């Protein structure tokens, strides 16, 4: 577990934010102003006991009284009980469990929500969407996540599944998604999808500057973007096709929710203008007639710690120390 420290004034309320990801778990003490007091990270737990032990190791580092624990986790979360109702993939061991029971929060209030929603909370409270009341956040990484704020309220839906934008159907005959559907956005634009599509190009012996690693590992999405920027035709072909699906999905989302701003986050956002320019071009040409305005598109402001900050933000919102 690796800590990082910054300063926070002694009169600030402080909460613990925990972000449970597929490959890493992060935690931080966060002040009500959004200041990161101290942060921790390690590879993701693979058992309930490992999750419990990590959180309690963090709690023992507290230097001040804590207002509570906020949890951001993939999957569908019952916010009233902290139950993980659906969670396929590497964190499946949490499915059906109450996070409050797994973590045993030592008398502290515990609040939980989907990790894309906690990322959205951090942007609305302290980041690129500060002060906005209608926001869509799209996270692009190994998978595709999403969260939506409408008139100051986070959309959760009847079963807590609202905002799972990565599971919009874009291709009725597309590949099978982990959700059981076919042709989801996540199967067309995600690190998994881009790297798999690039592998198919390698198997067809298409001209390319990249190759498989010594152990047969795929070129990373970052490397594919870099190769495309340097003129690699295979990389450019893969990304052009993936971006067609992404821009189509973005245009649909903007027509449905009519946000003040669209926030793009996740590891793929590091591609910068290669990602943002085609999205902005598509939005400018395909939404202006109906929406009558240009919708700002911005990258996530709290890069690297939005998940833990937003998880702590759950505590501050629930205890009415902050409001959206």
Where are these regions (language model features)?
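Glycine-rich phosphate-binding loop and adjoining helix at the ATP-binding site
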Residues: 43-56, 68-69, 76-136, 273-286
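Short glycine-rich, Thr/Ser-proximal phosphate-binding strand/loop in the N-terminal lobe
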Residues: 2-53, 83-86, 160
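Glycine-rich phosphate-binding loop of actin/hexokinase-like ATP-binding domains
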Residues: 132-189
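N-terminal phosphate-binding loop and adjacent alpha-helix
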Residues: 35-65, 230-233, 237
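Glycine-rich phosphate-binding/hydrolytic loop that grips phosphoryl groups
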Residues: 30, 113-124, 270-324
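Phosphate/pyrophosphate-binding loops at sites that engage ATP/ADP/AMP, CoA/4′-phosphopantetheine
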Residues: 53-69, 108-110, 128, 208, ...
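A mobile "lid/hinge" subdomain adjacent to the ATP/sugar-phosphate binding pocket shared
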Residues: 186-263, 296
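Glycine-rich phosphate-binding loop plus the immediately following alpha-helix
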Residues: 25, 105-108, 112-116, 170-205
